[in-house]
UniProtKB/Swiss-Prot annotation:
Superkingdom field: Eukaryota
Entry protein name: Paralytic peptide 2
Covalent S-S links between cysteines: none
Expression sites (tissue/organ): Hemolymph.
Amino acid sequence: ENFAGGCIPGYMRTADGRCKPTY
């Protein structure tokens, strides 16, 4: 599934619009 923001699986969207790993 694709999330808004287009981060790869295992990553989340941060408040500044970037992607960071959730681990």
